[in-house]
């Protein structure tokens, strides 16, 4: 007996039941007779599927029901596929249908599923085998009926989007006993010719029996083995054939297939305009870089130009000469200044000048001072100056028995025997007279 803590509400119970149903029956096929057919203004389809013993409610919502190729009616025997679920508000379980066909197609549907499973197990539908569509195809082969809305829609879209593409129609039956063989033959020939960048196989909508030519095993194998990319556009969006599984690309409609095959010329023009602008900017940038590089190389070349180098050396030489001249002038000015200073000092130390000054001073002596004493002082001072003058007079030294010796060639005063060599001629100044002698012996 269930514990009271586990008591459920009706909503909880219905939710649990719904989850169990959906997990146990994710997808079911059911065959029965239609009853209670209702199609309100919303576009949804509500029916009852029944047999002699039971019935089950079914719903097909507008996105699926609008593609039905027949008119559901009371008593019609159908084959349905859907997901089992529970309508929680009433506690009723129902099937949400995604496929509904007349019951005569049931055998075809089972044959289709068996063949699809077998080919899929062989790897015929492996995504790794798929080829990408060309970005800018030049020639496209279209295998379809030469009359009808399909080829008109395809040509209209292709010419509008990319009128430069070349389109070749390979007319074929798209329904009937011989259609599959004819489509297979045209596809094989188009692929082996190597003339086409892509091949489009297209047909309008129809029942499973109408589309049965595209569930042919040989056609599916030819599509999978093709070296040319193949795009299929067969029936409506809800219709799937073996040709769709084998093709490199499956389009929901022929018009969409045409859009997938070629680029939009308006987008291409816009892209080309953008590329042109980028190219112009890039060219201008490269040109600016080249000009800048040329300017730099010109400056470097100019800096290494021998003529420029010589001019630079000449400027440096002129500057060095100017600085040397300034330096010489400065040295001469300093020497002349020092010479003037020495001359002034020597002039001031000249005994004759001092005597003249003293004599001038004597004239201005105060007559009130004792003249005799003043005169004696000045005489003593005069005698001292005379002695000082005689002391520095070289002639006085000569008078005491010495001699002044000079080189005869340059009149240089000789103070050291190292200044002369044997054979040199010397002039000797004596107290009375002068001698010219030749050196025979020289010693230190």
Swiss-Prot record:
Catalytic activity line of the entry = Exonucleolytic cleavage in either 5'- to 3'- or 3'- to 5'-direction to yield nucleoside 5'-phosphates
Q: What InterPro entries does UniProt report for this protein, alphabetically? A: Exonuc_VII_L (IPR003753), Exonuc_VII_lsu_C (IPR020579), OB-fold_nuc-bd_dom (IPR025824)
Q: Which superkingdom does the taxonomy of this entry point to?
A: Bacteria
Task: Output one GO BP term.
Answer: DNA catabolic process
Q: What are the record keywords, sorted?
A: Cytoplasm, Exonuclease, Hydrolase, Nuclease
Q: Which gene encodes it?
A: xseA
For this protein, the parts annotated as crossing the membrane are: none
Record's subunit section: Heterooligomer composed of large and small subunits.
Origin organism is Xylella fastidiosa (strain Temecula1 / ATCC 700964)
What family, per the record? Belongs to the XseA family.
The name on file for this protein is Exodeoxyribonuclease 7 large subunit
């Amino acid at each position: 007996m269930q514990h009271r803590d586990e008591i459920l509400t009706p909503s909880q119970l219905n939710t649990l039941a719904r989850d169990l149903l959906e997990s146990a029956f994710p997808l079911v096929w059911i065959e029965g007779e239609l009853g209670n057919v209702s199609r309100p203004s919303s576009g949804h389809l509500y029916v009852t599927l029944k047999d002699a013993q039971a019935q089950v409610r079914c719903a097909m919502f507008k996105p699926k029901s609008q593609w039905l190729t027949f008119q559901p009616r009371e008593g019609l025997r159908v084959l349905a596929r859907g997901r089992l679920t529970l309508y929680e508000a009433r506690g009723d379980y129902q099937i949400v249908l995604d496929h509904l066909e007349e019951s005569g197609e049931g055998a075809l549907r089972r044959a289709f599923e068996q063949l699809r499973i077998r080919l899929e197990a062989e790897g015929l539908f492996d995504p790794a085998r798929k080829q990408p569509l060309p970005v800018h195809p030049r020639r496209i082969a279209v295998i379809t009926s030469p009359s009808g809305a399909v080829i008109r829609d395809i040509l209209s879209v292709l010419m509008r989007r990319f009128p430069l593409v070349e389109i070749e129609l390979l007319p074929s039956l798209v329904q009937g006993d011989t259609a599959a063989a004819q489509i297979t033959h045209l596809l094989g020939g188009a692929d082996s010719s190597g003339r086409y960048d892509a091949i489009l196989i297209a047909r309008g909508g129809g029942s499973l029996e109408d589309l049965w030519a595209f569930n042919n095993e040989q056609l599916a194998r030819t599509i999978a083995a093709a070296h040319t990319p193949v795009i299929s556009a067969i029936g409506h969006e809800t219709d799937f054939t073996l040709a769709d599984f084998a093709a490199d690309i499956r389009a929901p409609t022929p018009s969409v297939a045409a859009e997938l095959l070629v680029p939009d010329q308006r987008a291409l023009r816009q892209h080309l305009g953008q590329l042109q602008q980028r190219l112009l900017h890039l060219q201008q940038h490269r040109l600016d870089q080249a000009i800048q590089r040329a300017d730099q190389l010109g400056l470097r070349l100019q800096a290494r130009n021998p003529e420029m180098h010589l001019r630079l050396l000449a400027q440096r030489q002129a500057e060095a000469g100017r600085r040397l001249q300034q330096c010489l002038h400065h040295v001469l000015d300093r020497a002349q200044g020092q010479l003037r200073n020495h001359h002034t000092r020597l002039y001031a130390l000249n005994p004759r000048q001092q005597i003249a000054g003293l004599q001038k001073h004597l004239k201005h002596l105060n007559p009130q001072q004792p003249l005799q004493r003043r005169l004696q002082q000045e005489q003593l001072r005069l005698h001292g100056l005379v002695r000082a003058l005689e002391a520095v007079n070289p002639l006085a030294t000569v008078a005491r028995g010495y001699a002044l010796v000079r080189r005869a060639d340059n009149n240089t005063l000789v103070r050291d025997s190292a200044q002369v060599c044997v054979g040199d001629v010397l002039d000797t100044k004596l107290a009375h007279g002068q001698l010219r002698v030749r050196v025979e012996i020289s010693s230190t």
